[in-house]
Each structure stands twice: as C-alpha cells, then as structure tokens.
Amino acid sequence: MIKRFIVFGPPGVGKGTLASLVSQKYGFEHISTGNIFRSQIASNSELGIKLKEIVESGGYVPDSITNEIVKKTLADLEKEQKSYILDGYPRTLNQIEFLFSLNKAQEYSVWFLEAPSEIILKRLSGRRICPSCNAQYHIYFKKSKLDTKCEIDQSELIQRKDDQESSIIKRLEIYEKQTNSLKKYFKELGILVEIDASKDREEILKELEQKVSL
C-alpha cells in the first residue's frame, strides 16, 4: 500500500531535513519542489531561467508551473507503487485542491512543523553552499573545517540569494499570507499532525514516529 505524506511549515523550519531522515530510514521517496526547481535552474532551460528570476528575488513560483511538475513526478511514483513525502508542496489552497484531485485528502498525512521566527532566521541565514558540488555547510551548526572553503573540492562557499536576510523575511511574509488558513483546513480534514520543530533533528524524528504510523 502506498503511503503519502506532506511535510508542511515555514521556510527554514526543517522540512527537508526531516523528510530526508524519514526517507532514508523507511525507504520513501523524498519529493522536494525546491530541489526540482534548482535542477531546472542548473540546466539553464527556458523554464530554469524563468524560475531563477523568481527564486533569486524571493518571489513565488506560479501554481500552474508547480502543479504540472508535481503531477508528472507523482504519476511516475503512483505507477511504481512507491510511498513518498512531499516537501514544499502544497503551499496554497489552489495547490491543495489540485493535489486532492489526484488522490483523496484522507490518503495523506500532513506533518505541520512549527518553530519561532528567530530560530528560522538563524537556520537559513547561516547556510553556505559549495557552487561546484552542492555540499552544504552552516556557519552555526556545521562549519567547514576549511572555514570559508568546501572540504570536498576547496571551492569558495557561497550564500544563496534566497538565504540572505532580506529574502528570508520576504519569504516568511509570503508564507504567512498564503498559509494562515491552511493549517485550519488540514485540521478540519483530520489529517494534520503538529510537530515542534524547534528541537534537534533526532528529537523531532522521535516525536514524529510517536504520532505517525510510518
């Protein structure tokens, strides 16, 4: 039987980290719309160029683009009978309605991650990426042994534009406007699981395992 999960919450709350941990432990597919967008941007395709402009300005990718990308990805997984975790999708009522037109709402479990905004700001603004191999570091939690260089290939680490403070604040504002009513909506459907994401990753995973049948 296919298990379908949605990890939901503000930027920087740890959705990707939790989804990766669960995917590795239980063998689920981790579907990150952010990673899909970044691979499109790296390919320098027509869609990638369009996405790059939106992402670097801290803007929001239109539902029409995101929905079609997700639809194609999920169709392949459903065909192969693979369980999956959606990370970064859905984020609007339009996206939710689109997703639940593909599968019934009750076939999903929504993990709602929450943490104070100051913790989110610290987590995001401290991220550093290797532009060559995409290795990730953090100036507070996972410093490179080579200071500002990548341990793997010695490239100078960079901060993504959407991890700069001004972009983070803009993203959080967009999130608040778009998702205030979504938590209530998921709760009314009886598919919401609330998780305290201010703790460390092992404690967050433990809480999830206590609340959700994986």
Curated annotation (Swiss-Prot):
Pathway note = Purine metabolism; AMP biosynthesis via salvage pathway; AMP from ADP: step 1/1
Q: Name one GO cellular component term.
A: cytoplasm
Q: Where does Zn(2+) bind?
A: C130, C133, C150, D153
Question: Where does the record say this protein resides?
Answer: Cytoplasm
- Chain positions covered by the region annotation LID: 126-163
Q: Which UniProt keywords apply?
A: ATP-binding, Cytoplasm, Kinase, Metal-binding, Nucleotide biosynthesis, Nucleotide-binding, Transferase, Zinc
GO biological process entries = AMP salvage
UniProt-listed InterPro entries: Adenyl_kin_sub (IPR006259), Adenylat/UMP-CMP_kin (IPR000850), Adenylat_kinase_CS (IPR033690), Adenylate_kinase_lid-dom (IPR007862), ADK_active_lid_dom_sf (IPR036193), P-loop_NTPase (IPR027417)
The protein's enzyme class: transferase
Q: Which residues bind AMP?
A: T33, R38, G59, Y60, V61, G88, Y89, P90, R91, Q95, R160, R171
Name the Enzyme Commission number(s) assigned to this protein: 2.7.4.3
Q: Which top-rank group of organisms is this from?
A: Bacteria
Residues that coordinate or bind ATP: G12, V13, G14, K15, G16, T17, R127, K199
Q: Pfam families from the xrefs? A: ADK, ADK_lid
Just give the chief location class.
cytoplasm
Catalytic reaction(s) noted: AMP + ATP = 2 ADP
- Give the matching PANTHER family: NUCLEOTIDE KINASE (PTHR23359)
UniProt comment concerning the protein's domains:
Consists of three domains, a large central CORE domain and two small peripheral domains, NMPbind and LID, which undergo movements during catalysis. The LID domain closes over the site of phosphoryl transfer upon ATP binding. Assembling and dissambling the active center during each catalytic cycle provides an effective means to prevent ATP hydrolysis. Some bacteria have evolved a zinc-coordinating structure that stabilizes the LID domain.
Query: Which HAMAP family does this UniProt record tie to the protein?
Result: Adenylate_kinase_Adk
Q: What does this protein do?
A: Catalyzes the reversible transfer of the terminal phosphate group between ATP and AMP. Plays an important role in cellular energy homeostasis and in adenine nucleotide metabolism.
- Family according to the record: Belongs to the adenylate kinase family.
Subunit and interaction comment: Monomer.
Q: Mind telling me what this protein is named?
A: Adenylate kinase
From which organism does this entry originate? Mycoplasmopsis pulmonis (strain UAB CTIP) (Mycoplasma pulmonis)
